[in-house]
Amino acid sequence: MQTERELRQQIVEIGRRIYEHGFVAASDGNVSARLADGTILTTPTMVCKGRMSEDMLVLVDVNGSKLRRDERNPSSEFAMHKMIYQMRPDVHAVVHAHPPFGTGFAVANVPLDKPLLSEVILTLGCVPLTGYGTPSTDELPQSLAPFIPHHDALLLANHGAVAYGPELETAFARMETLEHFAKITLIARLVGKPHELPPDAIEKLLDVRERAGYMSAGTRGCQACGYSQGHSSTCAVGSATRSYGANGDDTVTLTRRELTALITEAARLVAREIK
């Protein structure tokens, strides 16, 4: 396990990355990491994640209470982090952000649950859409609860996204993969009808993921990205995912001007990331 000082340095770095990638604006988003003693280091409330310093971070107990009086107040959305840590002992880092493409799907009530990319099935799995919960209230973590044990990243209805993992780099990578998948899914829908991977290909990818140890026990059915017909295992939250993402198969209709503007903006964001 990393020391508190090392985690402070890494949280500041992750905050800088999500800001520079355009995953957050102003003081949006929050990042946390769990220490070996069970305490949690989290970003403070109302601070730009791209301009944080190590001394701005807040050390809290499992309930979110400050352990040092002279530190700032923790993120107002810490309850979401608390819920994830309580339900997933294997998780030691959480990243919450508002990536534009992923959040666009969340606002449109469309989960990222189609088996379109082999890399996504291997490294991330299905990204369901949770129900809406008012930010900074207990509604938000409660809306996530049915999905947390079975998934490593979630779209938050009309809000944003959250990703988590055994350490900060993995949590950030999952957020980055979520946004990348959202971009490709949108482009595929605009170009034509996305071609989903066949069942046998999905089964092989899930086998590889299980052998590599990238999948928690009992989550195989949930990681199949929307594929359920004839699957060897089913997802315990499948019905909830479908009810919250009822618009997943709707047709997207745009004017030529709107399509041109969207593709131009997508190209600009991709070029920005390459730089």
Regions found by a protein language model. Name each.
Residues 1-275:
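Glycine-rich flexible loops
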